[in-house]
Structures are given as structure tokens and as C-alpha cells.
């Protein structure tokens, strides 16, 4: 019984499965056709709507937005133009121009600096070499040059010591007797004293006379107090005019 039941169930299941599959295939075909038709219809409708409604609206909105943005940008440009010019001027005159100037100065001065450094270096080398060569030649030409120089220096020192005014400090004790003044020198000093006194008196008299002459000249220049007081008194204008009248009359008489 079990096998017959299983076989009957399998036959029934195969029939039911075939029916269900056929139904599903038909439903899928129907749904696919419906979806295709709906898609075509929606596409056509959307094209019509977009072409007649959305596209013109989008274009108008785009033009309006661009116009507003241009107006705002122009307004901002007008406001920011002085600042932009200021920034450009600062850049060109305070950054770019000094940088270019420094660059040009560096380009022009660096070769000169290199040449000058080489010239100094070569000058040092040449001078050192020439000095060494000439010292070598002098050592062969005048081997006793150092001794002659030392002798000349000692002679100069001795001459200076002899000419030094305070040379009595270096005198030996044996020479002190020769430095004591004698009676003849004392007599000569006594004879010379009155002559010196007469000269000093004559000089004093000359200086006294010159000072007195200077005093007299200064006294003559300075008027006494009374005359200064009289001179400082103001003179009226009428008196001044009267003083000039006789001069005019005398001038007229002379001319006549």
C-alpha cells in the first residue's frame, strides 16, 4: 500500500506542478506586457511634460540665477576693485620690484665680488712671494746689514744722550770738581748783573709808557659824564630845523 500511495502522490504532484508553472508563465507574460506598456506610456508622458513644461521652466530659472549671480559679482567687483588694486600695487611695488632689484643687483655685483676676492687673494700671494724673494736677495747681497743697522742705532742713541740737556745726572763723582763754579765766573756774573738790571728797567719803562699811552687813548675816546648826559637830552624838532637853515643860506650865498 505504501508504494501505491507514493506513486499516486507523485503523479498528482507532477500534474499540480505543471499547472502551477503554466499559470506562473502566463502571469509573468501578462505582467511583463503591462510593465512594458506602462514604461512606454510614462516615458512618452515624461517627454511631453519635460519638453513643454519642465525644460522651459528650467531654462528660465537658469537664466534668472545667472543674471542674479552676474549682478552680485559685478557689485562685489565694484566694491573690491580698490582693494584688488591696492593688493596689486603692494605686490608690484613692494614685493616684485624690490625682489627684481635685489636680483639684478646680485647678478651684477656677484661677479665683481668674485673678481675682487680673486684679486685680493692673488695680491696677497704675489706680495708675500715678492717679499720673500727680496729678503732672500738682500740676505745674499748685504749679509752684515743687521750689524750695520744696530751700529747706526747705537750711534744715534749716544748722540741723543750727549745732546740731552739733563746730562749732569750721568756725571761721575770724579767730574764734580770740574763742575764747581770758579772765581772768574763769579766776577763775570757780578759785572753782568747791573747790565741786566738796566735792561729790565728800560723794558719796564717802555711797557709803562705803552700802557699809559693806551690808557690816555681810551680816556680820550670816552667822553665825561656831563657831556654824555647833555648828548642824551632829546632835542626838539624845531631846533634841529633851525640848525640846518644857516647852512642852506650859506650854500645859497656860495652858489650865487
Curated annotation (Swiss-Prot):
Keyword Nucleotidyltransferase part of the UniProt annotation: no
Spans annotated as Disordered: 198-256
Compartments where found: Endoplasmic reticulum membrane; Nucleus membrane
Keywords noted in UniProt: Endoplasmic reticulum, Membrane, Nucleus, Phosphoprotein, Transmembrane, Transmembrane helix
Biased composition range(s): Low complexity: 203-215
GO cellular component, one term: endoplasmic reticulum membrane
Transmembrane segments: 5-25, 30-50, 64-84, 105-125
Cysteines joined through disulfide linkages: none
Residues with the Phosphoserine modification: 210-211
Main location class: endoplasmic reticulum
Membrane topology: Multi-pass membrane protein
This protein's name: Uncharacterized membrane protein C1919.04
Source species of the chain: Schizosaccharomyces pombe (strain 972 / ATCC 24843)
Amino acid at each position: 500500500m505504501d508504494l501505491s500511495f507514493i506513486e499516486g502522490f507523485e503523479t498528482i504532484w507532477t500534474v499540480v506542478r505543471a499547472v502551477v508553472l503554466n499559470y506562473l508563465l502566463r502571469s509573468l507574460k501578462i505582467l511583463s506586457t503591462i510593465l512594458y506598456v506602462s514604461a512606454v506610456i510614462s516615458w512618452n508622458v515624461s517627454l511631453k511634460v519635460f519638453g513643454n513644461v519642465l525644460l522651459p521652466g528650467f531654462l528660465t530659472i537658469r537664466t534668472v540665477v545667472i543674471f542674479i549671480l552676474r549682478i552680485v559679482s559685478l557689485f562685489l567687483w565694484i566694491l573690491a576693485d580698490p582693494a584688488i588694486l591696492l593688493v596689486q600695487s603692494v605686490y608690484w611695488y613692494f614685493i616684485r620690484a624690490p625682489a627684481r632689484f635685489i636680483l639684478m643687483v646680485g647678478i651684477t655685483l656677484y661677479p665683481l665680488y668674485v673678481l675682487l676676492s680673486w684679486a685680493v687673494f692673488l695680491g696677497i700671494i704675489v706680495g708675500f712671494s715678492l717679499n720673500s724673494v727680496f729678503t732672500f736677495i738682500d740676505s745674499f747681497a748685504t749679509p752684515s746689514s743687521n750689524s750695520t743697522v744696530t751700529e747706526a742705532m747705537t750711534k744715534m742713541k749716544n748722540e741723543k744722550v750727549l745732546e740731552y740737556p739733563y746730562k749732569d745726572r750721568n756725571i761721575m763723582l770724579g767730574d764734580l770738581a770740574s763742575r764747581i763754579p770758579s772765581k772768574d765766573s763769579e766776577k763775570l756774573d757780578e759785572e753782568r748783573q747791573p747790565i741786566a738790571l738796566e735792561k729790565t728797567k728800560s723794558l719796564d719803562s717802555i711797557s709803562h709808557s705803552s700802557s699809559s699811552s693806551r690808557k690816555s687813548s681810551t680816556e680820550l675816546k670816552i667822553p665825561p659824564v656831563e657831556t654824555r648826559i647833555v648828548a642824551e637830552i632829546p632835542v626838539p624838532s624845531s631846533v634841529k630845523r633851525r640848525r640846518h637853515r644857516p647852512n642852506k643860506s650859506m650854500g645859497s650865498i656860495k652858489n650865487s
